Design a protein with these regions (language model features):
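Acidic, metal-coordinating helix/loop segments flanking the phosphotransfer/catalytic sites
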Residues: 31-49
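C-terminal output helix
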Residues: 85-87, 101, 105-118
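Active-site residues of response regulator receiver
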Residues: 9, 53, 81
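Two-component/phosphorelay signaling modules centered on CheY-like receiver
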Residues: 12-30
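Acidic catalytic/metal-coordinating carboxylates
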Residues: 33-34, 60-63
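Receiver (REC) domain active-site loop signature in two-component systems and cognate sites
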Residues: 56
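AAA+ ATPase active-site-proximal loops
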Residues: 132-166
Length: 166
């Protein structure tokens, strides 16, 4: 679902407040108190955004960002911190963070950033799907040779069936 947000923060009050804002705004929210829990639940082609605190026990938000970038460099990660400074924000953005917000932040600021990040994610996933379809078409054309009406119909049917979630 393209309105999914994984929220990672060790502070339960922040998790609860963010969950309430996002749920009331129509987002599907998953909450995690630790970054490693989030990574364990992160699907391969997650159609959403990760929203993470920077400073947490165990794996930090910056370490989470690095691991997410290793798995999928196009998955938006928005970092939050109450102890931010300009060099940390610059480093995070250079390392691939989609955005860097300082606590306290307004719900409108967070929602705007999430909507832009989700729009970017949607475009990335659509682009990947189109590339996959083009690759499948090229493979099919190399396998099913000929230009007869029957082969053209067969190609269309195979391509239509290939898009079904089986």
């Amino acid at each position: 679902m393209l309105n999914s947000v994984m929220v990672v923060d060790d502070e339960s009050s922040i998790r609860s407040a963010v969950e309430q804002w996002l749920s009331l705004s129509g987002f599907e929210v998953q909450l995690f108190s630790r970054a490693d829990e989030c990574l364990a639940q992160l699907p391969k082609h997650f159609p959403g955004v990760i929203l993470s605190d920077v400073r947490m026990p165990g794996m930090t938000g910056l370490e989470l960002l690095a691991e997410v970038q290793r798995r999928d460099a196009d998955l938006p990660v928005i970092l939050l911190t109450g102890h931010g400074d300009v060099p940390m924000a610059v480093e995070a953005m250079r390392d691939g963070a989609y955005d860097f917000l300082e606590k306290p932040f307004s719900p409108e600021t967070l929602l705007g950033s999430l909507r832009r990040a989700l729009d970017k994610r949607r475009l990335v996933l659509e682009n990947r799907a189109l590339h996959e379809q083009a690759d499948n078409r090229a493979k099919l054309d190399a396998t099913l040779l000929g230009v007869s009406r029957g082969l053209q119909t067969l190609r269309r049917q195979v391509l239509d069936l290939a898009t079904l979630p089986v």
